[in-house]
Amino acid sequence: MTNSPVFCFDMDGTIADLYAVENWLDALRSFSARPYAEAAPMMNFSALARQLNAAQRKGVKLVIISWASKCCDPVFHADICMAKRNWLAEHLPSVHWDEIHVVPYGTNKAEVCGVTGENFFLFDDEERNRDQWEELDGLAFNPSDITEILKAINRGK
């Protein structure tokens, strides 16, 4: 169990606008990782990077926990992992993630991250993931709450 806060971020629909990429679903069904590479950031990433780095300096652990495509085989999973890591390196180059997990679609993210209570925060657009997180007493939020939560943590609240 950790005493330091752990902030876990989904990617698709949370920080990466996958669903706005043209023909994203057809591409994934064709085993193309292109939409993951082309997704636009969903917020001001200069400000987000500053907030994440400030939180990390205060001891917050930063984790990515993201699903791979529903249609997936081991080769495509590896392609997705690479595309997501490259996306993070391109869009948030100053952020040094403590962990990056790209897991099979539908995996319980709370179990992957070892949620053991309210020091574990999840930012995810998927209600099911937030519900599973809260079942283990973690704190789960919509993506729209990222900025305010980070500001509060960085102010020491």
Stretch-by-stretch model annotation:
Residues P5, D98, F120:
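Conserved acidic residues
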Residues H101-R128, W133:
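Conserved Lys-Pro-Asp/Glu-containing loop-to-beta segment of HAD-superfamily phosphomonoesterases
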